[in-house]
Every structure is written in structure tokens, then in C-alpha cells.
Amino acid sequence: MRRLYQTVCTLALLLVGLQAAHADDIIDVIGGQEGAMPVAVIPFAVTGEIPTPDQDIARVISDNLARSGRFEVLPREELVARPAGLDDTRFSAWRALGMDYLVTGRMEMDGHRVSVTFELLDVFRGNRIEGRRYRLHPDNLRSLAHAISDIVFEEVVGLPGVFGTQIAYVQVEERNDQRIHRLMVADADGQRPREILESRQPIMSPAWSPERDRLAYVSFEGGRSEIYVQNLRSGQRDRIASFRGINSAPAWSPDGRHLAVTLSRDGRANIYLLRLDDGHVRRLTDHWAIDTEPTFSPDGERIAFTSDRGGRPQVYTLAVNGPGGVERVTFDGDYNARPNWSPDGRRIAMVHRHNGSFRIAVHDLESDRTRVLTDGPWDESPVFAPNGDMIMYSAGGSGDSRLRTVSVHGRANQALPRAGGLTREPAW
């Protein structure tokens, strides 16, 4: 349970439960594929030998689409045929299976490069929605699979795909009776992980810059919490907050010029705005309670954060500039924490204690209703995908923590692969 509020470490023990205030406004939407669009992803026809283990890009595309919750992918063993494009597709057979879409393609070696053609077909109309051709190095086939997945997703759903994006997270392993913490970056499906930083002291709260070229995070390498910003291209890392007491929970402003952070330099944990070009800090909250875990609204005008000023942890908002005081957002349940604002500004994801379990929920700011998306019992650290259509979080608690994704409609929930140890604190 300690990690459910680990951005303030042992202060988490102060944040315990309260009786639910508006239980009728809590909706469970866990599991099921109702409303998902049926699609068949055909293994790409291959001419010649492709010198890479990533040649089955259809499998990557299938996994991506299924994980989104927007598609119900036909199992490969149920395919009635394996067309390579529009010209050799018998649409009547796929209509009989109830398919809405087909994804087909071909691959062949062209010198030292691979020529790849893919088509997205509309089964009902019997036509081609999209078709493209690529020529690339075999090592880039997995990236191409993510790009094709993004195209299919956007053509069908109307939202940008996120399969070609990257995630950051913290991996924890035991080595020679010591706990090793690693800051990692990987593809959105958890594949191709690479290490950014290793430490024998805790690393927490990674956060992407808006340009996605820098990570802010908390490190205890100096014996206490400090906030760093690291450039992923150059590797340069700068310590930007090392005040007395707690330095935690960095969150980027949409313009990339500021970080909202939690500091206790004045004796209490409050939210501050830190200007990156000169290090100037401005206090945004001034309360005896614990104020922590800030997250910006997409327009940068407001910040949501966790506070126990009402007696138990709940989500509040405040205006970054100008008039407007602190407003309480959540009243459903006895514990709501770790808010993350959706890219469209309409929802806040959070950790919600429901029926004794810590679960991921989404609070709709317009309807003021809370939807529970996961089963728990130890789910934490939710973060929206860049398109707002999925949420990544850490499940399993401190003993067996791993990353999972859940669609915002609750249709799909899948675990990401892990090479070893525990995976937690995702940033997307």
C-alpha cells in the first residue's frame, strides 16, 4: 500500500479511508468486447527470406488493435483465407464471419531492403480504404507495424493512433541482495526496452516533456528526493529541485516551460510552479494538509492534484493564474488520488478505492460521474495515452507490480511484457 502514494513516500500512511459520499455515481465498466469492431489481420504474404525475427508484422498489428479495445480481432486459426490484397479477396466469405475490416499485405526483399505493401479493406463495401507501400531496412519492420496500426486506427476510429509512441517506467530488480532501480523507455507495447538510468536508490514519477525529448523524474541517489530533467538525445541530466524536505511529483506544463512539483521546503507539502529557464518557484497552494501529485489541464490553465485537506485523499483543482480558488472534484468513495488529466480535458483518471480495492477509475468532469475500469486490488499510477483512448497503470502492488493497459471504455485490459523484476510508475 505504501506505493499507492509513493511520491510523498512515508507520508502516504497519513492518507486513509472515508465513507463513500455519492455511491450512486460510481459505475463499473469492466471487461467485455461489446461495441468493438470486428477485424481480420491477415499474415502478410512473404516472398523470399526476410532476415529479421520481426517479420510477422501482422501479429504486431493484431496485438496493437486488440489492446486498444476498439477492435475485436479474429483469431488467426479462424481465418477462412489469406488474401494479400484487394484483388484476391472474396468479401462474401468475410461478411459471413461478421468482419467489418481486413488488413492485408505483402513483403519481399529488394536488395538489402524490404518492400512492404499493406491495404485496409472495407468488407461491407468491398473496397480499399487505404493502401501504402514502403521500402525500409529489415530492422525497422516492427516500427512499420506500429505505423500501420496507427493508420488503421485513425482511418476506422477517427483518432490518432498511439502504437508508435514510447512509454517510460521504473523497473526494480534484486541483484546481489540489493534493490536496483532503472528508468526505462520502451515501445508503447512494452517491447524494445532500453535503460536511461540505473541507481541503487529509488527512482520515481517519470514524466514526458511535451516535445517527448526529455524526462523529468525523482531520484534518491543523493540520499533524499531530488527532481532531475534528462535529455534523451544528449543524455544530459540537470538537477532542478533540491530543496529542503520533499521534492517530488513533477508534471510538465503544456508549453514545456514549467514543472508543477510538490515541495515541503516551508514545512508542509504544497504544490509549486517551477520555471525551468531560471529555477524560479511560485507556491500555488498553502495549506496544512498534504497537497501532491499535480497534473496540468491540456490548456495549462488549471492543475488537478491530490489533497487530504478534507480529512482523506481526494482530487482538487486550482487555477494556475488569475482568480479562482481550490475546488474539490471527487466525492465518490473514500479515497481518490494520483490524478491524470485526459488530453481532451474532459476527464481525470485516478486511483479510486472501491469495495476495499484500489482500482483505476475515470471521473467525467461534465457529468460528475466516476467509472471504475479495473478490478484491483492494488492498481495505481494511471496515465492517459496521448490520444486519450487508453490508460496505462501499474497493477499488483509492491510484491508483483507490472504494467497494464485498459481502454477507457473498459473493453480491453492487457498486461505488458516484462523482462524481469517489477515494473511501475508508467509515463505515456
UniProtKB/Swiss-Prot annotation:
Key word Amino-acid biosynthesis present: no
Signal peptide positions on this chain: 1-23
GO biological process: cell division; protein import
Cellular component terms per the entry's GO annotation: periplasmic space
Major place of residence: periplasm
UniProt keywords, alphabetically: Cell cycle, Cell division, Periplasm, Signal
Subcellular location: Periplasm
Pfam families to which the protein is assigned, alphabetical: PD40, TolB_N
InterPro entries given in the database record: 6-blade_b-propeller_TolB-like (IPR011042), PD40 (IPR011659), Tol-Pal_TolB (IPR014167), TolB_N (IPR007195)
SUPFAM superfamilies: TolB, N-terminal domain, Tricorn protease N-terminal domain
Subunit text: The Tol-Pal system is composed of five core proteins: the inner membrane proteins TolA, TolQ and TolR, the periplasmic protein TolB and the outer membrane protein Pal. They form a network linking the inner and outer membranes and the peptidoglycan layer.
Similarity section: Belongs to the TolB family.
Function recorded in the entry: Part of the Tol-Pal system, which plays a role in outer membrane invagination during cell division and is important for maintaining outer membrane integrity.
HAMAP family with a match to the protein in the record: TolB
Protein name (record): Tol-Pal system protein TolB
